[in-house]
């Protein structure tokens, strides 16, 4: 319940900015993983704005194309990064080229697929808004949707494909880290939906914030790995499902879930037993009260 309360309050606070940036009226993203990166985006974006000359690095995905030509295209970046990963894995030339083409295809197709999602869901959102206005006397209601709606944004694609090899290399050499992200890399796109509304699509800011949050996330995953592994082993023992099986001598983790700031804070609070849970309960109630006061104030305007 604490996790849900944290997330719902954050999505209420961020909904207007999200809707204006993505041009998705009445829609918000309540997923904990996406919302947990918003505090980093707010803090670091303000720090960047305080650095003299940093504003000159205001390059979005379109600016990247103009500056680097065809090399700035997400499709070409996907091919290059995919081929480099294949080369680093010491694959043969055929597999290197196949991986490059596959990564490029992903970068090209994701925006097209998400555009279809948006076209299909917009009428539902509009009708729901009409129903809310009729039944709830015009009160403002945000409709929670999947972040898959917006992961096709060009800046998200560029930042994701660049950070995949970078975070793999960092994970190997990062002191104290015991987690190597592999399958979790598929969730890289979901890191950015709530970062972009604050960086305004600036590729440089987005890359730096993404890198910092991922590095911190590696430590979160390492810290939670023992209990994550225990839970997976218990599921495997009860169900026999090989998807939950972690081989002996290994620990499991998930960068696309366990690196969540909200999840880690709640995990640490629960580990403190009654004291931690009491603190979480107080914070949850306080956030509920503050959010209600904000909503009432907005409705009076």
State where each predicted segment sits.
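Short, small-residue-biased leader/transition segments that mark boundaries at the very start
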Residues: 2-8
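Hydrophobic alpha-helical membrane-embedded segments
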Residues: 9-17, 104-123, 210, 214, ...
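Transmembrane alpha-helical segments and their short flanking loops
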Residues: 15-31, 94, 131-138, 178-301
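Juxtamembrane inter-helical linkers in multi-pass membrane proteins
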Residues: 17-61, 112, 116-146, 232-239
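Short juxtamembrane and helix-loop transition motifs at transmembrane-helix boundaries
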Residues: 57-66, 139-151, 164-177
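Long, internal scaffold/assembly segments composed of regular secondary structure
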Residues: 61-111
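Alpha-helical transmembrane segments and their membrane-interface junctions
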Residues: 79-88, 154-173
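Transmembrane helical segments that form the transport core of multi-pass membrane transport proteins
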Residues: 89-154, 158, 179-182
């Amino acid at each position: 319940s604490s996790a849900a309360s944290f997330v719902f309050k954050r999505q209420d606070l961020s909904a207007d900015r999200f809707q204006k940036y993505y041009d998705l009226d009445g829609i918000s993203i309540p997923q904990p993983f996406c919302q947990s990166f918003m505090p980093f985006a707010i803090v670091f974006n303000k720090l960047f704005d305080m650095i003299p000359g940093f504003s000159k690095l205001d390059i979005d995905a379109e600016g990247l194309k103009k500056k680097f030509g065809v090399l700035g295209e997400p499709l070409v970046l996907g091919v290059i990064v995919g081929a480099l990963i294949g080369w680093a894995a010491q694959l043969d030339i055929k597999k290197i080229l196949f991986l490059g083409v596959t990564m490029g295809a992903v970068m090209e197709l994701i925006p097209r697929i998400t555009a279809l999602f948006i076209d299909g869901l917009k009428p539902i959102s509009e009708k729901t808004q009409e129903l809310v206005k009729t039944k709830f006397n015009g009160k403002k209601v945000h409709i929670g949707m999947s972040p898959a709606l917006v992961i096709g944004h060009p800046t998200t694609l560029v930042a994701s494909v660049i950070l995949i090899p970078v975070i793999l290399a960092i994970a190997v050499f990062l002191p104290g880290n015991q987690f190597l992200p592999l399958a979790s890399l598929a969730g890289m796109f979901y890191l950015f939906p709530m970062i972009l509304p604050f960086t305004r699509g600036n590729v440089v800011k987005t890359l730096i914030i993404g890198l910092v949050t991922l590095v911190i996330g590696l430590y979160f995953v390492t810290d939670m790995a023992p209990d994550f592994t225990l839970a997976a082993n218990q599921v495997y023992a009860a169900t026999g499902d090989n998807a939950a099986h972690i081989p002996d001598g290994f620990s499991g983790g998930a960068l696309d879930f366990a690196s969540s700031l909200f999840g880690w804070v709640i995990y640490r609070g629960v580990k403190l037993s009654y004291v931690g849970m009491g603190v979480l309960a107080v914070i949850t109630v306080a956030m509920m009260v503050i959010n209600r006061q904000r909503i009432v104030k907005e409705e009076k305007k």
